[in-house]
From Swiss-Prot:
Role, per record: Uteroferrin is a phosphoprotein phosphatase, synthesized in response to progesterone. It appears to function in transplacental transport of iron in pig.
Location of this chain's protein in the cell: Secreted
Glycosylated position list: 124, 155
Record-level GO BP terms: iron ion transport
Residue positions binding Fe cation 2: 79, 118, 213, 248
Signal peptide: 1-20
EC number(s) given by UniProt: 3.1.3.2
Organism (species): Sus scrofa (Pig)
Protein's recorded name: Tartrate-resistant acid phosphatase type 5
GO molecular-function terms, A-Z: acid phosphatase activity; ferric iron binding; ferrous iron binding
Disulfide bonds: 169-227
The UniProt record lists the keyword ATP-binding: no
């Protein structure tokens, strides 16, 4: 059975419960659900044809996933344009690496919510923000910002806080195992940290996600980002964040700590790296899944959020489902108590 057939069967199981092997005129209301794709490090190359085979394969697989399962939006986890970002809002890379690649009709009306990676910061991040006024599907309002959604046909809410981890921690070389040493502008870093601290303290949504380019935890080439482990992780833990999503390392990983906080690493949109160099730098028991096969065309994460739980499925660009996990909705008492 080919992988696209598997996706179609999965769609049927999600949308038409009880439909197999039974005849009935009773219609079951569709499950309230919010769906999105999370893909990082997809940004092509700076020379013709300005994309890679992996990026093209991921674009095709994302389109197939959207057609079969649906998606309300796509979350871009940074490194949108290799290797030195873009020059201005009219840079041809927007067309050649983004518009012409993610061009399937199924993707034309799916919005992208974007954040910057370290390679984007080697160019003009303000130009990527300005491109939001040119492309109807490119949404990048500011270096860091909040997204808020309601799960359709429910009162259940989801918040996603999009961070600029490069401004927060400093830049680094994506192809060398190098930690960001210090923020270029300490005042901007402190302002952003104060913002996310205030936002998380006030967050009353049923699911709270935080996204940034650099990982908190990673077993791969770059490993854990010391700056985020020190400054961001305590906030994620204190405020009962559901999951942190990131890229930077060029593979797929899922980690989960002793508090149930999930770490979704999806950095396989354009390159693949099998490194497990920092396996011993991550606490024992955190790693649940790692995929970095060099002969793979990469992949992405597909997230589904219902009133009951959030599921994360890692999908290879071939269409194969690699790993799936579930995270619970935040307990009402947790965030209501913090508001009291």
């Amino acid at each position: 059975m080919d992988t696209w057939t598997v996706l179609l069967i999965l769609q049927a199981s999600l949308v038409l419960p009880g439909a197999v092997g039974t005849r009935t005129n009773t219609r079951t209301a569709p499950t309230p659900i919010l769906r999105f794709v999370a893909v990082g490090d997809w940004g092509g190359v700076p020379n013709a044809p300005f994309h890679t085979a992996r990026e093209m394969a991921n674009a095709k697989a994302i389109a197939t996933t959207v057609k079969t399962l649906g998606a309300d939006f796509i979350l871009s986890l940074g490194d949108n344009f290799y290797f030195t970002g873009v020059h201005d809002a009219k840079d041809k890379r927007f067309q050649e690496t983004f518009e012409d690649v993610f061009s399937d009709p199924s993707l034309r009306n799916v919005p992208w919510h974007v954040l910057a990676g370290n390679h984007d910061h080697l160019g003009n991040v303000s130009a990527q923000i300005a491109y939001s006024k040119i492309s109807k599907r490119w949404n990048f309002p500011s270096p860091y910002y909040r997204l808020r959604f309601k799960i359709p046909r429910s009162n259940v809410s989801v918040a996603i806080f999009m961070l600029d981890t490069v401004t927060l921690c400093g830049n680094s070389d994506d192809f060398v195992s190098q930690q960001p040493e210090r923020p270029r502008n300490l005042a901007l870093a402190r302002t952003q940290l104060a913002w996310i601290k205030k936002q998380l303290a006030a967050a009353k949504e049923d699911y709270v996600l935080v996204a940034g380019h650099y990982p908190v935890w990673s077993i791969a080439e770059h490993g854990p980002t010391h700056c985020l482990v020190k400054q961001l992780l305590p906030l994620l833990t204190t405020h009962k964040v559901t999951a942190y999503l990131c890229g930077h390392d060029h593979n797929l990983q899922y980690l989960q700590d002793e508090n149930g906080l999930g770490f979704v690493l999806s950095g396989a949109g354009n390159f693949m790296d099998p490194s497990k160099k920092h396996l011993r730098k991550v606490p024992n028991g955190y790693l649940r899944f790692h995929f970095g096969a060099e002969n793979s065309l990469g992949g992405f994460a597909y997230v589904e959020i219902t009133p009951k739980e959030m599921s994360v499925t890692y999908i290879e660009a071939s269409g194969k489902s690699l790993f799936k996990t579930k995270l619970p909705r935040r307990a009402r008492s947790e965030h209501q108590h913090r508001r009291a």
